[in-house]
């Protein structure tokens, strides 16, 4: 599935870049479920660079950045993957359920280490080392404003992402769709409103 996704991304990026003039073109690229597969970053970097040659790019990540590569998963703060995302130029990211696998303290440190904002509108930090994240960011590209509002699944047991209850202590997760709807007002001040989510197809 990961190879199929990467192939589709490469083809889509090439097609968009081939026909897109530089002026007033903004391409939004999203990575998702990377699962620490850092061996795929060279191909991904090539695809992103080709798009940037002909258009303005916003690069986002929809969660599950680790759990899947022993080297990355044992590294301090999962930094090898984050460093590659810094090099790739990610603009914003949200949380997936596997971000919590590392424990709340490690996740908090990883969020602090990121050079891009990590956002999530439906996670409430009540008694957790994880900071209360901003619900959205607004990015300017080609004179237009792009708002990204983020949410993570709460469809697991006890209304939190999939995982053991213990790793979510001190956190509360509101309904993702209802929370996203609260930010419809951003349409009044932005030209584009994007839901950056890790909520599956439900």
Regions found by a protein language model. Name each.
Residues 1-5:
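Positively charged n-region of N-terminal signal peptides that target proteins for export
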Residues 7-15:
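Bacterial N-terminal signal peptides
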Residues 19-202:
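Acidic, metal/ion-coordinating pockets
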